[in-house]
Every structure is written in structure tokens, then in C-alpha cells.
């Protein structure tokens, strides 16, 4: 009996060893298979990562190119409209309210088409809420465009780039806001740059297309335009925080108001009949008007696209650098004469704007949501387009 048991035990031990060996072999085979498949999986993940980021980078380049192309063209056309003299009588198309009403119509149609394509939800913002913001916007835009008749286009673009000044000034005066110390440094640098650029020596008649016009008056109405931007920004912030409208919806509703207000202004100033007579007498101006309106509408869509896809900080960086190139294009294309002091002033202003963007990026990394005050004011115009960010 003991011998039989011993034989059975040996057999069972042998079977257990064989079973363990089989299990071990299976485990090794599985490990080998997994090890072979891991590089393939990793390669697939890497390829997917590269393709995704390559698409994003190409799309970003596409957005940057769109903003640069259409807003640089817009700047050229805008200045061309204000300096071209038609006919033997050397008449200038000076019907600002009529022109801006047409621009708002094109912007409104553009926003409406985009909202249809995107099938956006209904905007819960009361329509009348857009009225006050639109009124400030109309005043700001009208004065900004009117100022080009008295000062050079580079001066206008440089001044309108300086949003930190009115935003901080109005924030302190009306809303008792507090800002980081570096923001005040930004304002000092930009203010000094603007002051140097606008010295009497720097604003001689050779820089002004309409001789005899008072550049001091042009600077004054430009200053009022900037103050309107400073007042308008916080009200827009509040509207966006409270009702959360989409960028396209805000563009559409604001431009409906703008169209109505600019139309009233154009009729009140007697511009409608005069502008139509001018167009009939000099039909070549139609090409400039259409280019002005179309580049504005398309450029705005690129602004919205960039903000929605890549954020307001990236969009602010693009628009800030774009304004710098707009000044350069205007200087070289139209032959504006600048001295060394003015070039230094331009560098100071854009240096301050870049510092403002750097502060905003640094705060974002620290988890502090602080939009660049150098960013374009969020309203749908061609000069300072809307940004679709609640943090703005």
C-alpha cells in the first residue's frame, strides 16, 4: 500500500510540475506578445499625437494668416478711402457715418450666415442690453475713423492700440478697480511712447494727408474715442458674464444696433444723399467701399475663429503684432515720414503692449485669470474686433 501511494504521489507531483511549466510558458509567450505589440501601440499613439498637433499648428497658421492678410488689406483700403482725391475737383469721400453703416451691414450679414451654418442656440441676452454698449461703440468708431481726416493713419493705429490707458483710467475712476503694479508700468511706458510720437515736431504737415486740418483736433477726438473704449469694456464684461452670449450672436445683435444708429447719424448729417451722388459721379469709389466692408467682415470671422480655438491671449498677441505691421505697411506704402524719435516711440508703445501680454501669460500659468488689457476691446468693428471670452 505504501508503495502504491508513493507512486501516486510521484505521478501527481510530476503532473503539477508539468502544469506549472505550461503556465510559465504561457505567461512568457503572453509577455513576449505584449512586448512586441507595445512599440506598435506607442508608435500609433505618437503618430496620432503628431498628426493632431500638426493639424492644430497648420490651423493656427491659417488663422494668423487670415487675420494678417485681411486686416492689413483693410488698413490700406481704409487709408486709401480717406486720402484718394477723385476727379478734377480733387474730392475726397468723407462720408464716415454712411461708410460705417455699410460696414455694419456687411458684418451683420456675415454674422447671420455663420450663425445659420453653426446652428447656434438662441441668445438669452435681452436685445435692449446691447443698446448702451452699441451707443458707446458707435461714438468710439465714428470718432476713430473721423480722426484719420486730421492725423496720419500710423498715429491713429498706434493710439488705438493703447487700450491699457483708457481701461485702467476708467477702471480706477468709475469702478474703483485695483491693478498689479506692473500694469501701471505698462501704462507709463505706453503713455510716454504716445506722447513722444505726437510731439509737434513729430506731427508736422508732411505726415498729414489733408493740409490745413488741425491735428490737435484729430488727437482730441481720438482721445475721446479711447475713453469710450475704456467705458465700454467693463459693460461688455458684465453682459458676457451675466448672459454668456456666443461671439457670433453678440456680433450679430451689436451690428443690428450699430446699423440702426449709424443710419440715423448718416441721415441726420445729410450724408446719404451726398454719398449716393458722390458714388454716381465717381463709380470707381465702389471698389474701395466694397473692399473696405468685405475685408472687415472676413477679418472679424478670423478673429472669432482664433479666439474660440486658441484663446483670447493668443488672439491678443496676433492682433497686437498685426497693428505693428499695419503701421509699417502704411508708412512705406503711403510714404509717411518718421524721424528717429517716432521710431523709438513706436518701439516703446509695442514694448509696453508685449509686456502687458507677458504679464497676462504669467498670471495664467499661476492660475490667475487676468486678460491682457492690451487686448482688443470686444466689439464687432474692423478696427477693434470682438473677442469671445468670458474672462475678457
From Swiss-Prot:
GO CC annotations, alphabetized: endoplasmic reticulum membrane; Golgi membrane
UniProt signal peptide: none
GO BP: any one term: UDP-galactose transmembrane transport
Main localization, broad class: endoplasmic reticulum
Low complexity bias (residue ranges): 25-35
Compartments, record wording: Endoplasmic reticulum membrane
GO molecular function, one term: UDP-glucose transmembrane transporter activity
Ranges for region Disordered: 1-40
Basic and acidic residues composition-biased segments: 7-20
Residue span of motif Di-lysine motif: 389-392
Membrane-crossing segments per the record: 57-77, 97-117, 124-144, 155-175, 179-199, 215-235, 247-267, 285-305, 341-361
One Pfam family linked to the record: UAA
Membrane topology: Multi-pass membrane protein
Keyword hit for Transport: yes
Superkingdom: Eukaryota
Keywords: Endoplasmic reticulum, Membrane, Sugar transport, Transmembrane, Transmembrane helix, Transport
Domain comment, as recorded: The di-lysine motif confers endoplasmic reticulum localization for type I membrane proteins.
Annotated family: Belongs to the nucleotide-sugar transporter family. SLC35B subfamily.
Role summary: Probable sugar transporter.
Name used for this protein in its record: Solute carrier family 35 member B1
Organism, scientific name: Dictyostelium discoideum (Social amoeba)
Gene: slc35b1
Amino acid at each position: 500500500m505504501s508503495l502504491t501511494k508513493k507512486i501516486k504521489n510521484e505521478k501527481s507531483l510530476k503532473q503539477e510540475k508539468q502544469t506549472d511549466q505550461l503556465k510559465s510558458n504561457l505567461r512568457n509567450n503572453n509577455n513576449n506578445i505584449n512586448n512586441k505589440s507595445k512599440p506598435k501601440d506607442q508608435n500609433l499613439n505618437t503618430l496620432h499625437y503628431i498628426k493632431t498637433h500638426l493639424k492644430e499648428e497648420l490651423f493656427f497658421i491659417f488663422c494668423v494668416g487670415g487675420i494678417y492678410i485681411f486686416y492689413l488689406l483693410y488698413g490700406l483700403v481704409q487709408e486709401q478711402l480717406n486720402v484718394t482725391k477723385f476727379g478734377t475737383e480733387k474730392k475726397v469721400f468723407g462720408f464716415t457715418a454712411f461708410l460705417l453703416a455699410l460696414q455694419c451691414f456687411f458684418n451683420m450679414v456675415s454674422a447671420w450666415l455663420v450663425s445659420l451654418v453653426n446652428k447656434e442656440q438662441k441668445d438669452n441676452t435681452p436685445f435692449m442690453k446691447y443698446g448702451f454698449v452699441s451707443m458707446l461703440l458707435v461714438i468710439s468708431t465714428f470718432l476713430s475713423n473721423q480722426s484719420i481726416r486730421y492725423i496720419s493713419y500710423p498715429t491713429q493705429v498706434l493710439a488705438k492700440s493703447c487700450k491699457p490707458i483708457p481701461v485702467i483710467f476708467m477702471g480706477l475712476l468709475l469702478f474703483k478697480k485695483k491693478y498689479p503694479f506692473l500694469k501701471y508700468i505698462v501704462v507709463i511706458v505706453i503713455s510716454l511712447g504716445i506722447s513722444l510720437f505726437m510731439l509737434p515736431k513729430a506731427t508736422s504737415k508732411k505726415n498729414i494727408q489733408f493740409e490745413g486740418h488741425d491735428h490737435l483736433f484729430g488727437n482730441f477726438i481720438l482721445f475721446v474715442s479711447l475713453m469710450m473704449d475704456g467705458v465700454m469694456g467693463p459693460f461688455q464684461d458684465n453682459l458676457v458674464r451675466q448672459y454668456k452670449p456666443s461671439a457670433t450672436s453678440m456680433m450679430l445683435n451689436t451690428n443690428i444696433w450699430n446699423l440702426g444708429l449709424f443710419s440715423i447719424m448718416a441721415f441726420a448729417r445729410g450724408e446719404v444723399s451726398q454719398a449716393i451722388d458722390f458714388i454716381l459721379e465717381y463709380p470707381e469709389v465702389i471698389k474701395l467701399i466694397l473692399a473696405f466692408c468685405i475685408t472687415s467682415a472676413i477679418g472679424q470671422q478670423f478673429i472669432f475663429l482664433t479666439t474660440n480655438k486658441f484663446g483670447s491671449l493668443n488672439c491678443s498677441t496676433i492682433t497686437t503684432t498685426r497693428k505693428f505691421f499695419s503701421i509699417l505697411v502704411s508708412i512705406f506704402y503711403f510714404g509717411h515720414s518718421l524721424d528717429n524719435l517716432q521710431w523709438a516711440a513706436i518701439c516703446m508703445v509695442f514694448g509696453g503692449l508685449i509686456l502687458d501680454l507677458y504679464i497676462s501669460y504669467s498670471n495664467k500659468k499661476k492660475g490667475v485669470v487676468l486678460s491682457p488689457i492690451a487686448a482688443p476691446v470686444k466689439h464687432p468693428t474692423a478696427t477693434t474686433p470682438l473677442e469671445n471670452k468670458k474672462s475678457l
